[in-house]
Amino acid sequence: MLSFNPRLQPATLIKRYKRFLADIVTPAGEVLTIHCANTGAMTGCATPGDAVWYSTSDNPKRKYPHSWELTQTQIGDWICVNTLRANELASLAIDNNQIVELSGYTSVKREIKYGDENSRIDLLLQAENRSNCYIEVKSVTLLQQQCGYFPDAVTLRGQKHLRELQSMVANGHRAVLFFAVLHTGIRQVAAARHIDNRYAELLAQAQQAGVEVICYGFQLSPDGIALDARLPLLLDETPNS
């Protein structure tokens, strides 16, 4: 479990703007401008009036010491909007052998240069007498009809990562796309063809070439985030009712 220490503080969202900033109001009535690490569209994750939870850094050099971590929607779903947490959560779960599909490796390296397109892999797993395992981690927060979609905006970077993973398989390695589902309302995951058709096409190609796609949900609270159950990946765009 990833624990928030000190515990996150509550507030109410006023608005998100300039991608990286949000204004909130605390229970005491103080208006704060906080940092938002999520560069995506954040559809359904940033509705004015939602309850938000933020952390505070003790780094005196930070212009905005507070960071937006969680949202609780007005229907009760929890969302981790800090996309930087996805890599941390995946790495922690692998270190603790909680993801059976990714267990048995003796070395976990992070942010290693690889591929032909000047990329960095999120996680590289290695073990003696086993192929290298290249893992790209993506955060899923877009919810529509209990289905989580990725991406929530056109992502040329994400398209590049799929090409790189496919290349790793062609070179004899293992390659995994790990979807960290950080919205408690999501029950299944699909490629957002209606948002980024090229990404959906590349994902299908990558799977056919041998890239594995693994989706896991997480339990979210102001105390921390813990790995939950594996979730199904839909091969088409029709959510289960």
UniProtKB/Swiss-Prot annotation:
| Superkingdom, natural source | Bacteria
So what family is this one in? Answer: Belongs to the SfsA family.
Q: Which NCBIfam families did the record assign?
A: sfsA
* Cited Pfam families: SfsA (PF03749), SfsA_N (PF17746)
Q: Which InterPro entries match?
A: SfsA, SfsA_C, SfsA_N
Recall the GO molecular function terms of this protein's record. Answer: DNA binding
Species of origin reads: Yersinia enterocolitica serotype O:8 / biotype 1B (strain NCTC 13174 / 8081)
Q: List the Gene3D superfamilies.
A: 2.40.50.580, 3.40.1350.60
Gene name of the record: sfsA
Q: What is this protein called?
A: Sugar fermentation stimulation protein homolog
